[in-house]
């Protein structure tokens, strides 16, 4: 792990960073191949990868390791309990969610941003995963940068914010994610990916349907319970319950768990997913909101397991109806789809995952963006990506 104490570092100076960046870029491509020096800036909420649930940090982990495997020089700014193939710069000793000493989450965040800024001249590109928290810094650095938007974009304050930060290059994780917020400077859509050998294809012979992820109204596990019951199938639920959703769990979900055909397993880790998903006849994904991506869908595909999902958010971009699962509009159609899952080819489903959703595929798409941004930087113009608005990298 490299990096220094923030207490011993001098305050960062933008003109100094600009000069250092120009010198380092002039030297960095002499006698070198196209390998890049990349900073990945992860949220500090969870470790990278997280011990259990945590979609953003998992994607950052997969992307970072894939970039290293492809031969690039990557530094990961994350919590000190992270595990990575890259150089780790510990921005805080451990995941903030697990640190009882942290009462103000902005303190670790501001320290992390300071560390990134002081080392910015070492990199060809900075890739942030902090949503809008990094924008004031990124706009003022002379280093090409981009930010992947991992969360929901329907918050009422965001249009005003992106009226101010309209030049920050951002990447959506699905085209559907952009719908409530068209203002940002979208330079591409890059879908998530998983390591090819992370999950194994299973036989689907367990005689149950699966629900995986988080207990919350927008994920609608209550709908999954009703669908499974109407289809005459057992349902296994592997999910976490956040504090904010405990009342929903207590009043809506817990009373349904007394049924003999529903089993609540709780939160599971990465090593348990192959068995859980691989033995399931199908994954139920009856979402009640515009899901930005839905990582559990491609986890199921990696296990060869079809997905029955509501036609909402990113679902039509991820699933191919009648091939990798069924896209439905309501519970009745979902029940009908359960009766058709035997017609789907689990080998074909896994093959579609290999073709579209591996971590290396995701990394190659991001490398195209890094190269475009750094090329613009080498011409003496700091790219804001406007020429590429709306481009999609979904291949």
Residue locations for each model-derived region?
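Catalytic cores of nucleotide-sugar-dependent glycosyltransferases that transfer UDP/GDP/TDP-activated
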Residues: 15, 21-395
